[in-house]
Amino acid sequence: MNFRRMLCAAIVLTIVLSIMLPSTVFALEDKSSKLPDYKNDLLYERTFDEGLCFPWHTCEDSGGKCDFAVVDVPGEPGNKAFRLTVIDKGQNKWSVQMRHRGITLEQGHTYTVRFTIWSDKSCRVYAKIGQMGEPYTEYWNNNWNPFNLTPGQKLTVEQNFTMNYPTDDTCEFTFHLGGELAAGTPYYVYLDDVSLYDPRFVKPVEYVLPQPDVRVNQVGYLPFAKKYATVVSSSTSPLKWQLLNSANQVVLEGNTIPKGLDKDSQDYVHWIDFSNFKTEGKGYYFKLPTVNSDTNYSHPFDISADIYSKMKFDALAFFYHKRSGIPIEMPYAGGEQWTRPAGHIGIEPNKGDTNVPTWPQDDEYAGRPQKYYTKDVTGGWYDAGDHGKYVVNGGIAVWTLMNMYERAKIRGIANQGAYKDGGMNIPERNNGYPDILDEARWEIEFFKKMQVTEKEDPSIAGMVHHKIHDFRWTALGMLPHEDPQPRYLRPVSTAATLNFAATLAQSARLWKDYDPTFAADCLEKAEIAWQAALKHPDIYAEYTPGSGGPGGGPYNDDYVGDEFYWAACELYVTTGKDEYKNYLMNSPHYLEMPAKMGENGGANGEDNGLWGCFTWGTTQGLGTITLALVENGLPATDIQKARNNIAKAADRWLENIEEQGYRLPIKQAEDERGGYPWGSNSFILNQMIVMGYAYDFTGNSKYLDGMQDGMSYLLGRNGLDQSYVTGYGERPLQNPHDRFWTPQTSKKFPAPPPGIIAGGPNSRFEDPTITAAVKKDTPPQKCYIDHTDSWSTNEITVNWNAPFAWVTAYLDEIDLITPPGGVDPEEPEVIYGDCNGDGKVNSTDAVALKRYILRSGISINTDNADVNADGRVNSTDLAILKRYILKEIDVLPHK
């Protein structure tokens, strides 16, 4: 098999920048007569003549706003240019930028800079080549002089410079157009024929992993679960497939099931159902022997009961890595490259988090005045790729980890794996407490510090600050202890206060047998928060142009009925008080489990129309899970209704799986924007939590199969052949949006540790990198780029890795539990003679068995077909089955 092929020219971009994109993204090597040889140029897009601009993209800062496109140059047929539209000039010259990153300047080399630029209004442009981040050293900048542009007149610049500094791999070619440089907005600036030439530099030729025709879970499949692969083919007829082992021996074969056009990927696909093959092994792969293609195969994969055993611990390790206020060190970090000093403990250059002030009063918060005070808010988890800490995002994340433990405790496995003391590799191991609760406590202790005291402001005492983060965004390639930005407490919100009440109530009941003092304090503060929220039910974290900081995400939420319900559920289950019981039973969300958010009204506007059950902004499903899981005083009929609602939601997602070519439980959103939303992978993970509970409550293995399908999509069976998890699969996530794990920014920063999941496809084009790299008509499932600058598709967060840890642990541990009334998934029911799996034994089974023995390319249930129970399926079984059908034998198996 031809597993790899050589690519050069601009496709080298996939290796140089360590990314993988749909093939439509790449420009080919240009042959411009105006520019030097492409192979000696440090830039990967120079002419824009193919309608593409990546890796050129834009940047907005300090009030700047812009847009961009590749357009035809008037009067010049066949010539295109990069057009930047300046919409708002912002406060500074760097408020509006267009730039090309991923440049290494070598000491002693001489470079030739060339570009043509023009505008439709008189303005100035400051061009520079220098560092992407602090201290922003500039190696070329036209001697600090901006270029003056006259309307309609092209300016061509050509200059030489020598790199007299040490070699620097953190460089970018940038044009600043904001602030004092700008004309009256809006206006256009055009860029074309841009080059950075070094005769001593040669673009490398690298090998790029092609996308195979057969898409599989690149890690593997559980033996007992249903197993599907997806074949990309426009054939309308079944295709022959073969499953081979690591010794290249055919162990199973059959014919594909044509499915036609898959809407979300725009691929024509078939399915391979090899569910009945349960033999454990490593290195299996598929081949399509009748398909004349260099890619008529799959990546290798395993079939094993332990494929998630390491993954679940890697997923949980993410939270230790994201701790604030503590050094990340060996032996807990997993490798020296991932160690770092403690961040935000009040040591310069940090401006936090031991004495963080409230946000200064301004127009943004005119309706939400707050007094000036400072708080020690050390600890907690950094939310994502930045250094912000957010209560609402941390709330659903810490709930998920504690729910993992609570379910394990109720199911009788809390003394195993990550749940037991000493099971996780964290500093608190062997302290007498369950490790996963220790990790959750790190966040809960931070939450406590975010609550307003009577002394600080009696008018809002008990309320909780929404978030704490930097005043402005910092650049990638910055460790937490290096962050120089001022940090502020953003105003309190009802949503944050109710997240606090819910999770501290949950924490109280889980800690009461281990640390009663801590548990009592959690409950006391949770009840204070509840009363404060009742007093201030409408302090919303609204979205405003500046609500991101701009040094943090807004996490806006203007509907909190779901948070009130969730908090009441947790407080009721912990205390049994009628106050909370009455509140939750009268909530419009009582016992609700959304299948598609917003259907019953009240969901956060950002989530309405999205397939899924809960997010940081839509939380009623969390409360319903708690009521269904934990013993409480509700009527038994209500608890059963909650469990039924969980199963009903899961059933709708199983229907989606059967409709989707790549068998995933979400479909395109049914809101005004459609497509796939930010964090689409997290919607799937949260759905899988609900599927897990549906299996717990019903014993129906179809929900386990749905979880396996979801994992297969995330681990490679998708339109991009992409595993969205670091360290797992043939094409794993490599370049998440993170300020530390960012080797694309500089080689001095490490690749990410294993077990981290990316947000995944987002067809709403919400960052400049994805907008520059992927065409707007790209199918939603393919709107993704594994690039450190793409925060809207490649972000990593605590509230996404938490469900990833939950799901991997569940699938790894499922063999430890048999649900009430259920069947042990390791021992599925065998109906001897039912070869075709229709629940009956008749002549059609004999025909199927005969065709299987003759290798006619069909799949059968081999367990059922082994009618003499000798562990083999052969002509002896066929003879016995015929006798049984003719009633010459009364019972199967017959030996």
Swiss-Prot record:
Q: What is catalyzed by this enzyme?
A: Hydrolysis of (1->4)-beta-D-glucosidic linkages in cellulose and cellotetraose, releasing cellobiose from the non-reducing ends of the chains
Give GO terms: molecular function aspect only.
Answer: cellulase activity; cellulose 1,4-beta-cellobiosidase activity
- Limits of the CBM-cenC domain: 40-199
Activity-pH dependence: Optimum pH is 6.0.
> What EC number(s) are associated with this protein in UniProt?
3.2.1.91
GO biological process assignments: cellulose catabolic process; polysaccharide catabolic process
Sorted alphabetically, the Gene Ontology cellular component annotations on this record are: extracellular space
Annotated active site: 386 (nucleophile), 737, 786, 795
Instruction: Name the principal localization, coarsely classed.
Output: secreted
Going by the UniProt record, its keywords in alphabetical order are: Carbohydrate metabolism, Cellulose degradation, Glycosidase, Hydrolase, Polysaccharide degradation, Secreted, Signal
Region span, Linker: 199-240
Q: Tell where it localizes.
A: Secreted
Q: Name one Pfam family in it.
A: CBM_4_9
Positions of the UniProt region annotated as Catalytic: 241-815
Leader sequence residues = 1-27
How is the activity of this chain controlled?
A: Inhibited by cellobiose.
**Temperature impact on function:** Retains 97% of original activity when incubated for 200 hours at 60 degrees Celsius.
- Annotated Dockerin domain ranges read 828-894
Record-stated family: Belongs to the glycosyl hydrolase 9 (cellulase E) family.
The protein here is known as Cellulose 1,4-beta-cellobiosidase
Origin organism is Acetivibrio thermocellus
Identify the gene encoding this protein. Answer: celK
